[in-house]
């Protein structure tokens, strides 16, 4: 039981070390539009939910999903959404475009939804209602949609930035 309770601390620590590594290796880069970690985390969580459906009539169905959701997904979504907000804020400082505005708005929405998710999880531990599971599903789906939008728009922004940088290189060679 103690090792199960240490899982969120280990995962958050691992995520923070990954973020620190990313920050130290990408110091000079200004383009930070694409975030894959939120998308992968949401796909993994939806996969675990589908493997262990809490709506089945078995006695302990959904326990694995609820434990993963409470102990791994919720702490990681806060860390990754905060890091995404930081990266997109840094990106927006250098590249102001419609894509960058969309990414910034979406990153703020992701962070606020992760805080709402934490509050709903805390409230469900205080007093459990059957509607809390439906709210978890709704938040998971909305976070999944937002992270997918973040991935797609971020990729489009990266292609736009690469085109701008390539054009600047060609202009530099001509001079």
Language-model features: locations:
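Hydrophobic transmembrane alpha-helical segments in integral membrane proteins
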Residues: 1-16
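Interfacial non-cytosolic loop connecting adjacent transmembrane helices
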Residues: 1-2, 51-70, 94-95, 115-141
């Amino acid at each position: 039981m103690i090792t199960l309770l240490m899982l969120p601390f280990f995962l958050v620590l691992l995520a923070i070390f990954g973020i620190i590594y990313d920050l130290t290796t990408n110091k000079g880069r200004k383009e930070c539009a694409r975030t894959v970690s939120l998308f992968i985390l949401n796909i993994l969580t939806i996969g675990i939910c589908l493997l262990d459906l809490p709506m089945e009539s078995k006695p302990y169905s959904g326990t694995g999903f609820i434990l993963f959701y409470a102990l791994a997904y919720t702490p990681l979504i806060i860390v990754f959404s905060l890091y995404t907000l930081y990266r997109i804020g840094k990106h927006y400082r250098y590249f102001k475009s419609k894509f960058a505005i969309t990414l910034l708005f979406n990153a703020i929405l992701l962070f606020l939804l992760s805080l709402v998710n934490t509050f709903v999880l805390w409230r469900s531990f205080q007093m459990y209602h059957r509607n809390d599971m439906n709210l978890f599903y709704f938040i998971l789906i909305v976070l999944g949609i937002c992270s997918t939008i973040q991935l797609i728009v971020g990729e489009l922004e990266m292609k736009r930035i690469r085109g701008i940088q390539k054009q600047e290189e060609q202009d530099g060679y001509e001079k």
